[in-house]
């Protein structure tokens, strides 16, 4: 018999991507950060579990539960957060209260929303106050310019009454909720003030007349 030496090289499973060969969840997280659509296709492919989750029963259980989600973007985000490969996106606001004094006409303004980090996040807006109007009541992390989103709102003049008008804008994510208080003060028009003063003076004069009698 002749012994023929040979060497067998066994290569771990991998996925060929725009970043080259990737073999683990750390690599996959980097792919999701830099080539998100490619990472999404890979995440929902039949090969994902065999390449990235072999020997990791916890990650496999999380994956099996999330891949059936109605929102694919949320599934990927929750998976990466659950396996500690990215931080959850959190929001912060530049203010929590706005006050408008001596309001006279419709006006528009905005609230600056800042997000931390990368990934997918869905945001919902609710308003309390008939004088407030917002065009867009749902948006996602894709609508941010860098880390900033400007939430525009309008105060509608024809729905603001004399005196104090209180309203709120609620900003909600699956993990956070914010409330921005809006206070609008509208004074009585000068002409109406003059007429009101005349009426009060007439009432006072009439009262004095009857008291004198």
Located regions from the model:
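Feature for long, exposed domains in two main contexts
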Residues: 1-213
